[in-house]
Amino acid sequence: MKQYDYKTISRTMLGDLHTPVSTYLKVRDIFPQSALMESSDYHGSENNRSFIALCPLASVSIDHGTAIFRLPDDSREEHPITDAYRVENALNDFRARFHVEGEYSNYCGLYGYTSFNAVRYFEDIPVKDSREATNDAPDMLYILYKYLIVFNDFKNEMLLLEMLQDGETSELDQVQKAIHNRNYTAYDFRAIGPTTSPLTDEEHKANIRRGIAHCLRGDVFQIVLSRRFEQRFTGDDFKLYRALRSINPSPYLFYFDFGGFRIFGSSPETHCRIEGRHAYIDPIAGTTKRTGDAEQDALNARYLHDDPKENAEHVMLVDLARNDLSRNCHDVKVDFYKETQYYSHVIHLVSRVSGTLREEADPIKAFIDTFPAGTLSGAPKVRAMQLISRLEPHNRGAYGGCIGFIGLNGSLNQAITIRTFVSRNGVLWFQAGGGIVAKSNDEYELQEVNNKLGALKKAIEMAEKM
């Protein structure tokens, strides 16, 4: 197994004249297949930096039962996923190929996504083949980038970071030159025709009633059923990302350009975060609409906090997060419980569950054992996913999976892929769902999906006017 050794070089710049968005606009045409990750709203010390990643060096993708390594010397390896060689083996083997030394090497790692479809590798879950060939993408894709631009949002500093092999000449000056460029190309965005869905309102309500029936029969306690929408467009979808981040600031803002397709969104929910030997899950369970009236929103938040159905769901999903972490952690506890958090169109109830990885535990396996989030599947999780695969007329693709960072040192920070667009060949796919329990009401659950999609639909309208 060949190992690739790198060292980091870096320089720090004053960042008060540069934002992540303006900088990305300057560098994206020079460095295609780049990524932007920001944080806003309810972020603290664990999430206070923004990143731009440029120039892919290597990648690991998993699709059709095979892990594909694309390596810095342009070589390619294929490794079938089997019971003896699982996804965590592939990710760990790929990470082990790279050794990075130097200051800020902790930022060097794999940036990308795990789609909901990846559940097929972790449990006995059938996944429908895509009926839209243009929406095909690997089940998992993570990229190691040569350059990182790191924004310290508290200090107004920019860090430029480059990974170099022995004998390689630095080109960090070219990155800095691009950042200082005052001109960049602007493109329009325009939606074409109406938004469509494979499901009508009545068909989705019928699905909800089927979910309620499964809860009443005792097949599941809760099941999360979703609905997909599609919108044709022309122009620059980055303008849509800008509109979405303005309308719906969230802890996880991201725009990934993977070449043939892009994934971008504004997610409020941490799927899993591992720092050192500490792991965290932040389940969101409980949603109500914002009205724009502060007094009414406060009343809605109090009703949400006290509603027996919402509380029962929240307790169930906090317990599921505890169980997920307990598979690889000890000292599992609830750090905060049922905190009310306000977003542009909705109010959420949020808790945090944490644990300490056992000495023998593998961080990647711990991450996989939490996938997918209970808040996007249900409880019991495996049975809920089996029913989701049967009831939803399409596979979920990126929706309900996760997106973010896997460090070469075993750290990771992954957001749940919700409030998100997938863009390919002039079509946007976006999706939302809600947790169904025995006492659910089909009309209310339909409205909850519409509430969650409110920010995305408003962003489309706003992007056309920018």
What is the predicted function of each stretch?
Residues 1-466:
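Extended alpha-helical targeting/anchoring segments
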